[in-house]
A protein has these predicted regions:
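C-terminal motif of bacterial Sec signal peptides marking the signal peptidase cleavage site
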Residues: 18-21
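Bacterial signal peptide processing site
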Residues: 23-26
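N-terminal export leaders
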Residues: 6-10
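Mature extracytoplasmic/periplasmic domains
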Residues: 317-318, 322-392
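Extracytoplasmic/periplasmic substrate-binding proteins
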Residues: 220-223, 262-329
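Extracytoplasmic ligand-binding site segments that recognize negatively charged/polar headgroups
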Residues: 59-72, 88-95, 111-273
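Short, polar/charged alpha-helical segment
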Residues: 42-50, 54-57, 62-84, 175
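Conserved C-terminal helix/tail region of periplasmic/extracytoplasmic solute-binding proteins
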Residues: 38, 277, 385-424
C-alpha cells in the first residue's frame, strides 16, 4: 500500500493551530488531577487535559484511517494542548464495550478506555447500563456547529444520543465500480436489478459476510430487507412481528442470489479490505465504500484502480452519523473531551473529506453554521477537491435512508449465519 500524502494534512493541522492559538502551560502526567464531568467550563477542561495521554479505542481495520488519525489529530493534540494521543486499534467496537463492562464488574476506578469511536448497538449497550459519561457533548465549544435538531444526528440507530455522544463524521453505503471495465449504463440501481446483473455475470459479485466487525455486510443485507418490504421507515422502531413477516423473503432473495456470487457463494469476504483486493485484482466488479466522498481515498492510497467511481441504488442507501463517547469511569475524560471538540473543528472536518488524506467520510457539522472566513475557505477548498469519483451530493441525498433500529442488527447477523451458512 502506498503512503498517504501528508502535505494537505499538515496544512490543515497548521491552520487549526493558527486559528485557535497556542498555550504554554507546562505538562504533567494528569494522574493526580480530577477531570471535569462536563464541558461547561472549557478553561477548566483544557487545564485538566494538559499532560494527559488519551486512550482512544477505535476500529483499526482501515490502514488509511489509522494513519489519518495519527497524522492529523496527534500533532495538534500534542503541540496545542499538551495531550498524547494513544490510538488503540480494535477488531470490533464490542471489544471496547466489553472492556468497559469488565472494568465496572471488577470495581475498577479510573478505567483505561477514555474515548470510543462508536454508534448503534454498542452505544445502546453502554447507555442502557449507565456506563457513559453524560452532559458534556452539547457543551463543547464546537458543538454549536452541529445540527442537533436533525434526527440523523440526535438519534443513533433510533436511540436518543442526549449529551453522551459527540458526532465525528457521516457515512453512507455505496457501491464502487471500475469505469474502465463497466459502463455506467449497465449498473444495477436496485436489489432486484442487482440480482439480475449478478446472475447475468456469474462470479463477478459478492458481499461481505454480515457479523460483528463487518457492519458493511450487515448494512448490505438490511438494504435488501428495506427494498423487499417496501421501504426503510417502518424499520426505525423494533417490531418482532414485522421481522417475522419479512425475514423469510430476505433469506429467499439472498439464497437465490447465492449461486451467482463469487465462488458460487460458498465463501464470502470477511471484511472490506478483502473485498477491495478482489475488486482490484479483477475477480469481482463491485466493491463498497461508506465514504461520502466516494472511493477517492482508496484511489489515493492505491487500494483500487484510479478509474474507480462510486454509485448508489435509487433508494435504500443506508447512511448515518458516527460518534465518539466517553466511558463514565474514563481516567482522562478531560483529554477525551478535547479530542471530541477537535474532531468538530472546521479545519479537521475539511481535512477528513479530502480523498488524498485517507479518511474520506462526510461532515458531522453543518457547514452553513461556519461563519469564520478562514474556516469557510478550508471547507470550500475541501469540497472542491472531491473529484469525479464521488457521487453527486444531490444523488446521494435522494437515495439516503436511515438505519434500522438496533435489535435488527443481531437478527440480521444471526439469521444470515443460520440461513446462508447453516449456523456456522
Amino acid at each position: 500500500m502506498s503512503p498517504i500524502p501528508r502535505r494537505t494534512v499538515a496544512k490543515l493541522a497548521l491552520a487549526a493551530l493558527v486559528i485557535a492559538g497556542c498555550s504554554s502551560t507546562s505538562a504533567d502526567d494528569g494522574s493526580t488531577r480530577t477531570s471535569p464531568s462536563d464541558a461547561s467550563d472549557w478553561d477548566e477542561v483544557l487545564a485538566a487535559a494538559r499532560g494527559q495521554a488519551v486512550n482512544w479505542y477505535l476500529w483499526g481495520g482501515s490502514e488509511s484511517i489509522n494513519a489519518f488519525v495519527d497524522d492529523t489529530y496527534g500533532p495538534v493534540l500534542r503541540d496545542r494542548f499538551g495531550i498524547t494521543l494513544n490510538r488503540v486499534p480494535i477488531a470490533d467496537t464490542v471489544d471496547a464495550v466489553n472492556q468497559v463492562i469488565a472494568q465496572r464488574d471488577a470495581g475498577t476506578t479510573g478505567g483505561a478506555v477514555d474515548l470510543i469511536w462508536i454508534n448503534g448497538e454498542n452505544f445502546a449497550t453502554l447507555r442502557d447500563q449507565g456506563l457513559l459519561l453524560d452532559g458534556w457533548a452539547r457543551d463543547l465549544p464546537n458543538a454549536d456547529l452541529v445540527d442537533w435538531d436533525n434526527p440523523a444526528v440526535s438519534r443513533d440507530f433510533g436511540v436518543d444520543v442526549g449529551a453522551m455522544e459527540s458526532p465525528w463524521s457521516s457515512a453512507q453505503f455505496q457501491f464502487v465500480y471500475d469505469s474502465a471495465r463497466t459502463s455506467e449504463a449497465e449498473l444495477p440501481r436496485s436489489y432486484a436489478e442487482l440480482s439480475d446483473w449478478a446472475c447475468a455475470h456469474p462470479g463477478r459479485f459478492t458481499y461481505i459476510a454480515p457479523g460483528p466487525g463487518a457492519f458493511q455486510g450487515t448494512r448490505f443485507v438490511k438494504g435488501a430487507l428495506f427494498e423487499l418490504s417496501g421501504g426503510a421507515s417502518q424499520w426505525a422502531t423494533f417490531d418482532q412481528s414485522m421481522w417475522d413477516e419479512w425475514s423469510p423473503a430476505l433469506w429467499a432473495y439472498l439464497d437465490a442470489l447465492r449461486p451467482c456470487l463469487w465462488r458460487n457463494g460458498d465463501t464470502y469476504p470477511k471484511e472490506e479490505n478483502e473485498l477491495h483486493r478482489l475488486f482490484a485484482n479483477d475477480e469481482i466488479d463491485f466493491t463498497i465504500t461508506q465514504a461520502a466522498v466516494g472511493p477517492g481515498a482508496l484511489i489515493a492510497d492505491g487500494v483500487v484502480p484510479p478509474t474507480s467511481k462510486a454509485f448508489v441504488f435509487d433508494t435504500n442507501s443506508i447512511g448515518d452519523v458516527n460518534y465518539v463517547a466517553i466511558p463514565a469511569d474514563a481516567r482522562h475524560a478531560a483529554a477525551a473531551m478535547v479530542v471530541a471538540n477537535l474532531l468538530l473543528d472546521p479545519s479537521m472536518q475539511a481535512a477528513q473529506i479530502i480523498p488524498a488524506n485517507g479518511f474520506g467520510l462526510g461532515y458531522a457539522i453543518d457547514p452553513s453554521r461556519v461563519t469564520d472566513p478562514e474556516q469557510r475557505g478550508l471547507l470550500d477548498d475541501a469540497a472542491g477537491r472531491l473529484g469525479d469519483a464521488a457521487v453527486d451530493p444531490a444523488v446521494l441525498s435522494s437515495a439516503l435512508v436511515g438505519d434500522a433500529a438496533v435489535p435488527y442488527q443481531d437478527l440480521v447477523e444471526t439469521g444470515w449465519r443460520d440461513q446462508l451458512l447453516g449456523g456456522l
